[in-house]
Amino acid sequence: MGNVMEGKSVEELSSTECHQWYKKFMTECPSGQLTLYEFRQFFGLKNLSPSASQYVEQMFETFDFNKDGYIDFMEYVAALSLVLKGKVEQKLRWYFKLYDVDGNGCIDRDELLTIIQAIRAINPCSDTTMTAEEFTDTVFSKIDVNGDGELSLEEFIEGVQKDQMLLDTLTRSLDLTRIVRRLQNGEQDEEGADEAAEAAG
């Protein structure tokens, strides 16, 4: 299939990883096409708050590369390989798409705040010292170069890459490896997913 997204090719994954993911995908989704509802079930994301639900929908849409309303196996592998193995700039491009809820090519303060709150509901960071509001203010004060209250893709990528604290915090807050680990290990991490759902509810 070649480059599926932003220069990230499925060929970079080991055959063992692909086989594991394919087996899990086809077990959970025999049709080969994951709907939003199945996506929630697949990751154990149930009983979420409205903002967390919006984040999950946005994540689904960014994984649905061809915008047909389904995630097929190739989109699924491309998304997971990006999250697990993607280079920093590739991940930042994906984060930007995730934050840009209305799809206008810019992230405003409300969009960022909403997504940060939703991410924390699903995947709480134990070492977070700032509230979601404080973190949003920090991001804008540090990387909104022209002060227009919106972040362009260029401002976002350049600003975050220049600031190790922001890069570390964003990477941690979007660390889906716990959820992905559950996928790879079957249901062993169900308890963690249930805790995340309770924290969000």
UniProtKB/Swiss-Prot annotation:
It is a lipid-anchor. Changing D68E: In COD3; uncertain significance. GO terms for molecular function: calcium ion binding; calcium sensitive guanylate cyclase activator activity; guanylate cyclase regulator activity. In the retina, it is expressed in rod and cone photoreceptors. Residues 31-49, 51-86, 87-122, 131-166 form the EF-hand domain. Homodimer. The keyword Membrane applies. Binds three calcium ions (via EF-hands 2, 3 and 4) when calcium levels are high. Binds Mg(2+) when calcium levels are low. It comes from Homo sapiens. Changing E111V: In CORD14; results in impaired guanylate cyclase regulator activity; at low calcium concentrations the mutant protein stimulates GUCY2D as the wild-type while at high calcium concentrations it does not fully inhibit GUCY2D; decreased affinity for calcium ions. Ca(2+) 3 binds at D144, N146, D148, E150, E155. Ca(2+) 1 binds at D64, N66, D68, Y70, E75. Changing G159V: In COD3; exhibits an about 18-fold shift of ionic calcium concentration at which the guanylate cyclase activity is halfmaximal. GO terms for biological process: cellular response to calcium ion; phototransduction; positive regulation of cGMP-mediated signaling; positive regulation of guanylate cyclase activity; regulation of signal transduction; signal transduction; visual perception. This is Guanylyl cyclase-activating protein 1. Ca(2+) 2 binds at D100, D102, N104, C106, E111. Changing D148E: In COD3; uncertain significance. The modification Deamidated asparagine is found at N3. It holds the Pfam family EF-hand_1. It is linked to Cone dystrophy 3: An autosomal dominant cone dystrophy. Cone dystrophies are retinal dystrophies characterized by progressive degeneration of the cone photoreceptors with preservation of rod function, as indicated by electroretinogram. However, some rod involvement may be present in some cone dystrophies, particularly at late stage. Affected individuals suffer from photophobia, loss of visual acuity, color vision and central visual field. Another sign is the absence of macular lesions for many years. Cone-rod dystrophy 14: An autosomal dominant form of cone-rod dystrophy, a retinal disease characterized by retinal pigment deposits visible on fundus examination, predominantly in the macular region, and initial loss of cone photoreceptors followed by rod degeneration. This leads to decreased visual acuity and sensitivity in the central visual field, followed by loss of peripheral vision. Severe loss of vision occurs earlier than in retinitis pigmentosa, due to cone photoreceptors degenerating at a higher rate than rod photoreceptors. It is found in: Membrane; Photoreceptor inner segment; Cell projection, Cilium, Photoreceptor outer segment. One of its GO terms (cellular component) is photoreceptor disc membrane. The gene is GUCA1A. A lipid is attached at G2 (N-myristoyl glycine). Stimulates retinal guanylyl cyclase when free calcium ions concentration is low and inhibits guanylyl cyclase when free calcium ions concentration is elevated. This Ca(2+)-sensitive regulation of retinal guanylyl cyclase is a key event in recovery of the dark state of rod photoreceptors following light exposure. May be involved in cone photoreceptor light response and recovery of response in bright light.
